[in-house]
Amino acid sequence: TKGVPQGSVVGPILANLFLHYVFDEWMRRNHSNISFERYADDTICHCVSLKQAEFILRAIKKRFAQCKLELNEEKTKIVYCKKNHRDIPYECIQFDFLGYTFRPRRSIDANGEVFLNFSPAISKKARTKIWEAIQNWNSNHWVPMELEDIAKEINPVIQGWINYYGQHNPRILKEVLQHVNDRLVRWGRRKFKGLRKRKTATVHRLGDIALQKPNLFAHWAWGFKPTASERN
């Protein structure tokens, strides 16, 4: 038999060791002018031209064939990193890597000028996974709990998301974390009888608490708090 069984505990380790020699060392010996990043079996090669990209793609396919491997044709593509002063027409101008989508985005420089930048932000797939994780939180058992107890339970997860996805274009992650505040609003409406039919009042109550305890939840400390009441 060939290969490592899917789901094997040692599978990722063996695959990583194999690719270290099949790909990493081969690239350094034969194509040291092309930088690359590899995480498990996901790899990016940085090329200076379409000609170079097509050349290295052919070389990698040949190398893999020699080692009884093949590329995933659906995921393998040449991407044009379009940004200011790079306006050559090309069909593929974005890609996903390790939970991020890299694509052209409008940015503002230190002088307030708008320019086109090729940069990462949390991918749609990663946003969906976070949303699903939040939806799967069993908030029913939160009802007898205080906010401090809920914070202790979910803060490690939220902080992990912020640490990983919040470094680039954090606005998009903040939109996803709105669902955390929504779950807290649901908790408040279930816990306090006077708020069960008053969603806006519950939001304001949480917003007022966030002003008093801005570091209670990881995303509040990050600056994404519920809206406080007008008196605040």
Spell out what each predicted region is.
Residues T1-N232:
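Non-catalytic terminal/accessory segments
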